[in-house]
A protein has these predicted regions:
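N-terminal signal peptide
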Residues: 17-24
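Bacterial N-terminal signal peptides
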Residues: 10-17
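Bacterial N-terminal signal peptides that target proteins for export
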Residues: 1-9
């Protein structure tokens, strides 16, 4: 099977997650976090609006399948979409002054929908993990899971060497 590479400057592992098969099928990925472990995945709450991301028990469900696509015009950033909300919705950081609330929103050319996926080099214990950073919030802030005992709420927080910011990206089942 032939693959078209979406971008070549990322590590080989991430590039393979961005590839599109020759038959037009887009690869779908699962995001898991070190804090929540292998049994929880990045998901969308099915609340009628289908717009709030959360960490939920992993399953073979559309809200946990994510498509990573190069963001135009700036291809060093990516958009994160899930088939559950449709091709016209992207993971977005709300530009509300606090800039820490995440929603699925109509895809547009806004910095809150552009993500960089950076190997977690500063966390040597998390080899093979990534930090998810957003253009709106800057490269010193990361997607984080709030350690509140339930470990399912997401926020944008100052990047630090914490397990809630280390993401494993695997091919979805």
């Amino acid at each position: 099977m032939k693959y078209h590479q979406s971008i070549i400057i990322l590590p080989v592992v991430l590039v393979s997650l961005l590839a599109t098969a020759a038959d037009g099928q887009t690869k779908q990925n699962r995001f898991q976090n070190t804090l929540t472990g292998a049994d929880k995945c990045l998901d969308i709450i099915n609340d009628g609006n289908n717009n709030r991301p959360t960490m939920a028990k992993c399953g073979n469900i559309p809200g946990q399948r994510w498509i990573i696509s190069a963001s135009k015009p700036n291809r060093k950033f990516y958009r994160l979409k899930t088939p559950f909300t449709g091709a016209d919705k992207c993971l977005n950081v709300v530009d509300d002054g606090e800039r820490n609330k995440l929603v699925m929103d109509k895809c547009d050319n806004v910095s809150g929908q552009r993500w960089s996926i950076v190997p977690s080099k500063e966390n040597p214990g998390y080899s093979g993990y990534y930090l998810l950073k957003n253009e709106l919030t800057g490269q010193d802030k990361c997607l984080d899971v709030i350690d509140d005992g339930r470990n399912n709420r997401l926020t944008i927080a100052e990047c630090s060497q914490v397990s809630g910011q280390s993401w494993k990206i695997n091919k979805a089942p």
